Amino acid sequence: MHHIVQFLQTNGGELLYKTYEHITISLIAVILGVLVAVPLGVVLTRMKKGAGTIIGIVNIIQTLPSLAILAFFIPLLGVGKVPAIVALFFYSVLPILRNTYTGIRGVNKNLLESGKGIGMTPAEQVRLVELPLAAPVIMAGIRTSTIYLIGWATLASFIGGGGLGDYIFIGLNLYQPEYIIGGAVPVTILAIVIDYVLAVAERKLTPAGMQRLKELS
């Protein structure tokens, strides 16, 4: 306990900055993932063939070791935050893409026909009918992706990306448990807090009727 208190006294200010770095690289990667995966998911629902293949390819990328992905970008982008964000972006895509595809495919076809009947264009159907109804499922994918990235972002320090992983790597290299705890505990707290916030957002986006069905089931 004495070592942990000493760690906080010595590194309190830097700990806040490392936490900010960790949140920043994770958040940027998730936002990029949303900007790519949601439109791609919409496009895949319009494809009669090939959607499963594309999702399968993204799934393969997801199974690659995190350190291998990070190392792959070093010759291309060097070291620092940029390659870390790009690598995390690739990991963020699958849950969002899969849930967008599943959510939109699950929209009641009668509602789409009603939209056509009142003169909605395909773009208006996506914007006003499909995305709002699929929003809870999409948000669940964003939530999953974000929690994954909070954990994976600790590896960003491997290529100089910063974040709370710096403390974990220092602790492992120098065998200083207080540094490991100083990095691991804030990451865990971040994951719990962000998961709670996104769970609330997911509930807010779920229509009242669907919420009642979930409660009854």
Swiss-Prot record:
Record-level GO BP terms: amino acid transport; glycine betaine transport; transmembrane transport
Protein's cellular compartments: Cell membrane
UniProt key word Transmembrane: yes
Listed transmembrane segments: 23-43, 52-74, 84-101, 128-148, 150-170, 180-200
Effect of residue 5 to I: In strain: ATCC 6633 / PCI 219
Mode of membrane association: Multi-pass membrane protein
Keywords: Amino-acid transport, Cell membrane, Membrane, Transmembrane, Transmembrane helix, Transport
Resulting phenotype, residue 201 to T: In strain: ATCC 6633 / PCI 219
Domain ABC transmembrane type-1 as annotated: residue spans: 19-198
Assigned GO CC terms: plasma membrane
Primary location recorded for the protein, binned into one broad class: membrane
Induction: Repressed by GbsR.
Stated role: Involved in a high affinity multicomponent binding-protein-dependent transport system for choline; probably responsible for the translocation of the substrate across the membrane.
Family: Belongs to the binding-protein-dependent transport system permease family. CysTW subfamily.
Protein name: Choline transport system permease protein OpuBB
Organism: Bacillus subtilis (strain 168)
